[in-house]
Amino acid sequence: MQGLMQDVPLTINHLFDRVERYHGHKEIITATAGGLERTTYAEFARRTRQLAGVLDTLGISADGRVATFAWNTARHLELYFAAPCTGRVLHTLNIRLFPEQLTYIVNHADDEVIFVDRSILALLAPLLHTFTNLKHLVLMDDGKGDIPDDLGGHALLDYEELIAAEEPIDFPEITDERRAASMCYTSGTTGNPKGVVYTHRSTFMHTAGAMMVDSLGVREADVILPVVPMFHANAWGLAHAAVATGATLVMPGADLSGPALANLIVDENVTVAAGVPTIWMAVLPELKGRDTSSLRSIPCGGSAVPRSLSEAYREQTGLPILQAWGMTETSPIASVCQLDVDQQELSIDEQADLRTQVGRISFGVEARVVEPGSTNPVSWDGEASGELQCRGNWIASDYYDDPRSRESFTDDGWLKTGDVATVDARGRIRLVDRTKDLIKSGGEWISSVELENEIMSHPKVAEAAVVGIVHPKWGEAALACVVRTDDSLTEEAVIAHLEGKIAKWQMPKGIVWIDEVPKTSVGKFSKKTLRDDHADLFMNQ
């Protein structure tokens, strides 16, 4: 027997229609070099429809790729909807990729137009002559930045002039919910980045997921500050969820410094502020003594959240960090560490320990932790570890035009995340490490993440990254690369701090002091850089 329910395509157009119809009075605030710019969703909707006309006038193909090289701004939000709502594909370019990687992804995706912020045009200009399919270059003036003389032969069109020349148009009907809506390439830490193509359906479902109370719980009453870039994994879905619900949006623009973000949180009464751990390390001291009572959630992902950082926020603001997990291939939210109701009655220390997990897998997503090289599940005892795999309504099924897809997906359709994890009796997941970052020393496995968390709990440590490098006795050994807040901190003091917290064989065999932990294009620790920099350290001792 078949059901008798309507089957309406799940499209991004529905999100746009709701904010246009119901929430036109709500605000979008953008921080610029010249101060705050305020607009409404009504104005956003009108301009987005004008921008749709711009794409037609420029002759962008019916399913053409519309690239952005931009910060989090109201203009970028207009592009987030104008492209997919007209059937085209938004391609957000990660501004922190290496030049050769940018050339690769622009050409691989066949981008026809790039919309670029003036403040970062100089980063893109030297590469313009390498883009083989690019037809148009459009400047979005965010208040500062020189305009290079050499633009690879491309005329520089002005965003505002293009908008002003168009009347708002109706969007075409999107009848196929599986039509491509946007694409984002992975950070490419090994080899060329891989393209993930999101559909209207997957984006709709992920947006609904972000609105669930056991996820991020985005709602109309929220004031959302997405510090996580719109050029990376859909800004964790916050831009779409804000539009769907009519939540106020606070866009940080180019200035992601601790003081600037703290001012936005306090001055705009932000309720949800989302970013990677390094962002929250910089913001914390800037919030000291200030009114942060508006905050209800601080989602954090991209890398493991140190227990000490989450607890520092709880002690200072009354609100611990909300750890979430995902990746470009998962749209990206796949789990959120909300505590169960009975766990909220546990001691402060016990709750803090639980918050170092990434939580239970999100509704709409399935997960399994399997033994290496098999589909055999590990025990749900919180101890046995294996590879975390997932599948679901907003999980990638393949990479765009890439033969490497077979390496990342199982024969039965699950995504191999590359994360090593444990799962407890309640299905709560703890990430042990990335597969490539586990350290095998003297035949025993060492989790670099666990070591980092313990080292970063020392009050004189700002950041710490642990890598495995070749050792003459142990084959491989842990090296801790540490950023101190106080130069009086010694190697002996760090080792003493670790005693009793980890086993002796897990101790780092060396500590090096560094000024800053190198980061990848998405703000994660670049352990490959550290391994390369210190590859022979133990062999030369």
Regions found by a protein language model. Give the residues of each.
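Adenylate-forming
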Residues: 71, 116-126, 143, 228, ...
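Conserved AMP-binding/adenylate-forming core of the ANL superfamily
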Residues: 28-73, 77-81, 98-103, 155-161
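Conserved AMP-binding/adenylate-forming
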Residues: 298, 305-324, 328-429, 434-438, ...
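Conserved AMP-binding/adenylation subdomain of ANL enzymes
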Residues: 204-223, 233-271, 286
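AMP-binding/adenylate-forming catalytic core of the ANL superfamily
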Residues: 68, 97, 103, 114-116, ...
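Structural core segment of the AMP-binding/adenylate-forming
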Residues: 15, 57-58, 85-164, 269, ...
